[in-house]
């Protein structure tokens, strides 16, 4: 829906990190077990470092550290602190010097940042993640040549083989070596695109189940009598290997004095950005805090916010004015919403959304822009957005004139509902990104949009790809190389806004079939090379609100269905009407090739073919498309 140090000893901080382990049965991946009725034990106390902390900053490798990092696995951090992972450590070495490894700070996000529900009691989407003790750790570095990345468990759990560690996307097929009982070494080749991947230790795996209660069921970690939904690490560990910027890219994405006047905030409390007179706000390495009752509403002169590697900014930015032709938000730093409550309402003193407000207009968004009738562009590059309290990115105004170039963007710790991915506006491109999201991830609402190389870790709410919610005119969309490494979409009833591909019914009344508009058209959308690792709930649900033509889904591979009944996993292709009863159309795929083309769609390695007898709702393909649309779709296996 619509500061860094070289050769310094880190603080000796002691804190226990809870690690919950369960047994899930022989049909699922091997997992560590806890004796029935026992309480999962906490990890060993984090204490003295194994070695002095050292970081790298040379032409081929750049890592960074926060001397104010603290182990706080269950409670909020102070304004001047950065939560350090109490579960993982990361070190990086150049491939030609594997024994000379440098530390890369490992961040950690916990549900609600440990705050609990402040000022509200209703559901916020973080219930299961909080109750199950989920966390998300991540570490970033810049590199220009091949590297070895060492990832160590701090939990006391051990492995005996590198094969007990899975890298996802699994297509990366990185070389792995066992260093010792808690450390694996991963060879990451250099790529101009970088890599964003999950490191998954077998003892950390758990399975989420649907308890089959009520209409939808609820997620639980209890196996007995329940249905498996997905297996994933309870404490995730993401590595973001980002390319060092050089030449024209560096000139475009890293500000200098030639770029304009620059304001350098001092680390610490930052609550005066509304009146900055410079054109550029440059956050150097360090920790910055806006507090829970402020976000930066920037003046018209500000065109660029830069977060340097090692900058950790607790806050959010609103570009209130629409006067700039070129905006930029760049840098490999972190922008964290951890201090805000869920749906922080600026009309309610930044407390949780009041009944008198509309969150769409008044709640804090991590990045918010206003667009004018004149052409505008945005470069969004490198930034890691952590723990959004609501939408992470919005643009309000003329959506046809705001064009975006998004590169190497990451989103982590999306525990709450409505923590969507990014909506790309007309003429925009996006590549080399990672999204942990708890709502629609890739929002395809506009024409002439191109997306490539996306890694998705999907939470419960919303689909992966969305182009519905209201009638639209969309033409020329290309989405390639999307990998869903995990998802917890679990509903046992048939929701309108879920699955991998989705065009939802109308947001005003999702049960209505009469809110379509035959005067609008969605056409020429191509989705190629979409891989879903592990189990998922459903493939495609299209509730067409517009005339629909030439939708091509090619090389769509699902690992397996979850443990729900086929009736919960069915795909739909439906045509809705307007209030006068006029039904939208879907192009004729057979024989005209102008409808919904599903080429090389497979489940568990078996290709689904319309002519092969494995496509229908109760069969492996789970395609329960309306009979009136028989000629509007085809599923087939193409020649190699």
UniProtKB/Swiss-Prot annotation:
GO CC annotation: extracellular region
First-tier enzyme category under EC: hydrolase
Catalysis: reaction(s): Endohydrolysis of (1->6)-alpha-D-glucosidic linkages in dextran
SUPFAM superfamilies: Dextranase, N-terminal domain, Pectin lyase-like
Entry keywords, A to Z: Glycosidase, Hydrolase, Secreted, Signal
InterPro entries: B_solenoid_dext, Dextranase_N-ter, Glyco_hydro_49_C, Glyco_hydro_49_N_dom, IPU_b_solenoid, Pectin_lyas_fold, Pectin_lyase_fold/virulence
Family: Belongs to the glycosyl hydrolase 49 family.
Name of the protein: Dextranase
């Amino acid at each position: 829906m619509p500061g860094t140090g070289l050769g310094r000893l880190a603080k000796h901080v002691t804190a226990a990190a809870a690690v919950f382990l369960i047994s899930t049965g022989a049909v699922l991946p091997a997992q560590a077990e806890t004796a029935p009725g026992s309480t999962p034990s906490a990890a060993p106390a984090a204490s003295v470092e194994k070695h002095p902390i050292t970081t790298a900053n040379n032409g081929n490798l750049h890592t960074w550290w926060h001397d104010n990092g603290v182990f706080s696995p269950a409670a909020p951090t102070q304004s001047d602190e950065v939560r350090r992972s109490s579960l993982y450590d990361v070190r990086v070495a150049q491939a030609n010097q594997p024994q000379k490894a440098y530390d890369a700070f490992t961040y950690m996000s916990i549900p609600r940042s440990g705050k609990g529900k402040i000022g509200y009691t209703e559901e916020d989407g973080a219930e299961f993640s909080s109750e199950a003790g989920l966390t998300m750790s991540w570490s970033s570095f810049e590199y220009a040549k091949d590297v070895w990345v060492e990832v160590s468990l701090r939990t006391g759990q051990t492995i005996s083989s590198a094969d007990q560690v899975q890298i996802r996307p699994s297509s990366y097929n990185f070389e792995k070596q066992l260093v010792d009982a808690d450390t694996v070494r991963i060879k990451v080749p250099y790529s101009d695109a970088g890599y964003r991947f999950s490191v998954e230790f077998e003892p950390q795996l758990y399975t989420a189940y649907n308890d089959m209660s009520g209409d939808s069921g609820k997620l639980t970690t209890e196996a007995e009598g329940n249905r498996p939904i997905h297996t994933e690490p309870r404490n995730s560990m993401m590595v973001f290997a980002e390319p060092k910027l050089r030449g024209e890219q560096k000139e475009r994405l890293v500000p200098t004095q030639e770029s304009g006047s620059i304001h350098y905030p001092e680390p610490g409390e930052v609550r005066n950005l509304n009146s900055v007179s410079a054109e550029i706000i440059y956050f150097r390495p360090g920790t910055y805090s806006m507090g829970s009752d402020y976000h930066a509403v920037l003046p018209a002169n500000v065109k660029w916010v830069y977060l340097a590697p090692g900058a950790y900014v607790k806050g959010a930015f609103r570009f209130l004015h629409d006067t700039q032709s070129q905006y930029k938000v760049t840098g490999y730093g972190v922008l964290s919403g951890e201090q805000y409550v869920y749906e922080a309402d600026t009309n309610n003193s930044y407390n949780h959304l009041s009944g008198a407000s509309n969150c769409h207009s008044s709640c804090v968004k991590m990045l918010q822009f206003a667009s004018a009738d004149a052409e505008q562009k945005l470069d969004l590059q490198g930034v890691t957005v952590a723990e959004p309290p609501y939408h992470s990115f919005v643009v309000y105004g003329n959506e046809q004139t705001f064009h975006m170039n998004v590169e190497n963007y990451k989103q982590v710790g999306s525990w709450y509902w409505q923590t969507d991915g990014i909506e790309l506006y007309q003429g925009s491109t996006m590549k080399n990104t990672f999204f942990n999201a708890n709502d629609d991830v890739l929002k395809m609402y506009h024409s002439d949009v191109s997306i490539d190389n996306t890694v998705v870790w999907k939470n419960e709410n919303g689909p992966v790809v969305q182009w519905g919610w209201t009638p639209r005119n969309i033409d020329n969309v290309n989405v390639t190389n999307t990998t869903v490494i995990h998802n917890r979409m679990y509903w046992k009833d048939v929701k309108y806004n879920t699955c991998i591909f989705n065009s939802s019914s109308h947001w005003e009344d999702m049960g209505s079939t009469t809110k379509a508009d035959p005067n609008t058209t969605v056409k020429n959308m191509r989705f190629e090379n979409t891989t879903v690792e592990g189990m998922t709930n459903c493939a495609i649900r299209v509730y067409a609100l517009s005339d629909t033509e030439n939708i091509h889904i090619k090389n769509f591979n699902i690992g397996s269905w979850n443990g729900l009944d086929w009736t919960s996993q069915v795909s739909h292709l439906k045509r809705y009407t307007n209030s006068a009863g006029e039904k939208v159309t879907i192009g004729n795929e057979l024989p005209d090739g102008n409808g919904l083309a599903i080429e090389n769609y497979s489940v568990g390695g078996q290709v689904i073919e319309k002519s092969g007898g494995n496509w229908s709702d109760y069969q492996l393909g789970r395609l329960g498309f309306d009979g009136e649309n028989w000629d509007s779709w085809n599923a087939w296996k193409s020649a190699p």
